[in-house]
Amino acid sequence: MKIAECMTQEVEIVTPDQPIREAARFMLRADAGIMPVSEGDRLVGMVTDRDIAVRAVAEGRGPDTPVREIMSGDVLYCFEDDEVEAVALKMSDAQVRRMPVLSRQDETLVGIVSLGDISRSEQSEAASIALDGITDPGGERSQSE
């Protein structure tokens, strides 16, 4: 099964120049802890509620701070034609719960996949594999803790 068959296609994004206040409002409205940061059609980063609450606040940054100043620029992603099990393993290895999905053709953002999406798919055992890896101590934890 391809990841495109279980990913969420309608994804809210923020731009690097938007203030973190707007990113936080989007997250609150969408009940999401992570948002892709896009410049035009290109994914340039991810911003998490943790980036806003911990990094920005700890550094004394205000609500008008541009997202680019606190986002993670080293983004792990998958392609829409990747197999669900392969993506679950990638999520497990990196210890992330969500991953942006790009088009292989032009590398534009086409969706986001979460453990919940995978668990509701026909490949629900892949979610168990990912969850086991995510809950193990260690790993990269670069996008969502």
Task: Give, region by region, the residue ranges found by the protein language model.
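Bateman/CBS regulatory modules and CBS-like beta-alpha motifs in cytosolic regions of diverse proteins
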Residues: 1-26, 32, 37-38, 43-44, ...
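Cyclic nucleotide-binding regulatory domains
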Residues: 44-48, 52
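Hydrophobic alpha-helical segments characteristic of transmembrane helices
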Residues: 110-112, 116
